[in-house]
Amino acid sequence: MKLTKNESRMRRKIRIRKKVSGNGARPRLVVYRSNLHIYAQLVDDQTGTTLAATSTLALGKQNGNALRLTVDNASLVGKEIAKLAKEKNIERVVFDRNGYIYHGRIKAVADGAREAGLEF
């Protein structure tokens, strides 16, 4: 039986997570993409805590209007997570694409974070 897109993504995710982990000095920047929003969070895998998180949903609530899931708004999420990281004195991160192909909105989050000063 053929694997669905999501099942393939979950298998890729497991392979990636075997190799990628974050710590306090260099946390993992995890990106999740749903049909309506994109989410990004910084995770310290040694303690199992989320250090910072943001999404198009959270940014939309701050602005008072709903943000649609576009490449431009994904870039805004990247810039916002970089700003939150800078507030916590985090300069370097490990990027976890969460099984998604590094293209489009996922790439836009990474590029936005790099523009705002995060090192991958």
UniProtKB/Swiss-Prot annotation:
Please name the GO terms of the biological process aspect recorded for this protein, alphabetically. translation
Swiss-Prot/TrEMBL keywords: Ribonucleoprotein, Ribosomal protein, RNA-binding, rRNA-binding
Q: InterPro entries attached here?
A: Ribosomal_uL18_bac-type (IPR004389), Ribosomal_uL18_bac/euk (IPR005484)
* MF-aspect GO terms: 5S rRNA binding; structural constituent of ribosome
Q: Name one GO cellular component term.
A: cytosolic large ribosomal subunit
* Database matches in Pfam families: Ribosomal_L18p (PF00861)
User: Which CDD domains does the record associate with it?
Assistant: Ribosomal_L18_L5e (cd00432)
Family in the record: Belongs to the universal ribosomal protein uL18 family.
Share what the entry says about its subunit structure, partners included. Part of the 50S ribosomal subunit; part of the 5S rRNA/L5/L18/L25 subcomplex. Contacts the 5S and 23S rRNAs.
Enumerate the HAMAP family for this protein.
Answer: Ribosomal_uL18_B (MF_01337_B)
Q: What does this protein do?
A: This is one of the proteins that bind and probably mediate the attachment of the 5S RNA into the large ribosomal subunit, where it forms part of the central protuberance.
Name the NCBIfam families on file: L18_bact
Q: What is the protein name given in its UniProt record?
A: Large ribosomal subunit protein uL18
Q: What is the lineage of its organism?
A: Bacteria, Pseudomonadati, Thermodesulfobacteriota, Desulfovibrionia, Desulfovibrionales
| Gene it is expressed from | rplR
